[in-house]
Amino acid sequence: MNIDMNRFISILQFLTRIPIKRDVPMEEAFHKGIIYFPVVGGIIGALLMVAYRGASLYLAHSLSALLTVGFFVFLTGGLHLDGLGDTFDGLYSNRNKETILEIMKDSRLGTNGVLAMVFILLLKLYGIQGLGEHQIYWGIILMPVMGRQAIVYGCYRTIYGRSQGLGHLFIGKVSKKELLISSLLTFILAAMHLPSLIFALLLPIGSQLYKGHVMKKIDGMTGDTLGSLCELTEGCYLLFILLITGAGLF
């Protein structure tokens, strides 16, 4: 098996619970596999679309949307959702940098974290419910693509905010070439749905604004803040599609 395929499988195993019975060694250049983040997002989205389509054949639209969101959490192991909760607990605790990082590291979930997680899950649920017949399939497929590409932007030209953790695998290690490749893959996937392509073009700006906000708080990015960026991007993506289509622009 060549290096690129090894990296792709490693990233697929890292970001999902998809059972792949293959041992792939963690290489020193594991971070180079970040170019596959949007591709893995597309795989997740395709599986979500199949799940939604299957459920909608027998169940009401609202229940199908609920099961799709639940399957999304299961498929990813709640990896980024957990980061969202930890980030909101820490960043908005009104403490200093060291205390914020300690709070984010704590496995216990606080009020801010619970509220953030509930809000984003409800936003996804009602976002999927609100998508029209011509938007829902692309919306479901491309939502995970946008979230994972946002992580790539979040890792570029920044520093790691703590001494250890999963975030060190990617943060500050993304080259301009890797950024361009992953962005191109995202644009190719989004090109099949014009509202999504517009969102993809705006995504670097939004990601940079988020990154700047986090950097002011803790002087860097962490795995938790990347997870939060992913979840917030997915929610904003659905909201953007609803707003732009609701305005009759597409």
Curated annotation (Swiss-Prot):
Q: Which residue ranges does UniProt annotate as crossing the membrane?
A: 32-52, 59-79, 113-133, 136-156, 185-205, 230-250
> Which reaction equation describes what this protein catalyses?
alpha-ribazole + adenosylcob(III)inamide-GDP = adenosylcob(III)alamin + GMP + H(+); alpha-ribazole 5'-phosphate + adenosylcob(III)inamide-GDP = adenosylcob(III)alamin 5'-phosphate + GMP + H(+)
Pathway terms, separated by semicolons: Cofactor biosynthesis; adenosylcobalamin biosynthesis; adenosylcobalamin from cob(II)yrinate a,c-diamide: step 7/7
> Where does this polypeptide localize?
Cell membrane
Keyword Cell membrane annotated? yes
State the InterPro entries in the record.
Answer: CobS
Spell out the family assignment given in the record's similarity comment.
Answer: Belongs to the CobS family.
Q: Which GO terms describe its biological process?
A: cobalamin biosynthetic process
Q: Which GO terms describe its molecular function?
A: adenosylcobinamide-GDP ribazoletransferase activity; cobalamin 5'-phosphate synthase activity
Q: According to its record, how does it sit in the membrane?
A: Multi-pass membrane protein
Q: What is its main location?
A: membrane
Return the EC number.
2.7.8.26
Instruction: Give the originating organism.
Output: Alkaliphilus metalliredigens (strain QYMF)
Spell out the GO cellular component terms annotated for this protein, sorted alphabetically and separated by semicolons: plasma membrane
Pfam families in the cross-refs: CobS
Q: Taxonomic lineage of this organism?
A: Bacteria, Bacillati, Bacillota, Clostridia, Peptostreptococcales
The entry's function note states: Joins adenosylcobinamide-GDP and alpha-ribazole to generate adenosylcobalamin (Ado-cobalamin). Also synthesizes adenosylcobalamin 5'-phosphate from adenosylcobinamide-GDP and alpha-ribazole 5'-phosphate.
Provide this UniProt record's keywords sorted from A to Z. Answer: Cell membrane, Cobalamin biosynthesis, Magnesium, Membrane, Transferase, Transmembrane, Transmembrane helix
Q: What is this protein called?
A: Adenosylcobinamide-GDP ribazoletransferase
Which cofactor does the UniProt annotation name?
Mg(2+)
NCBIfam families, sorted: cobS
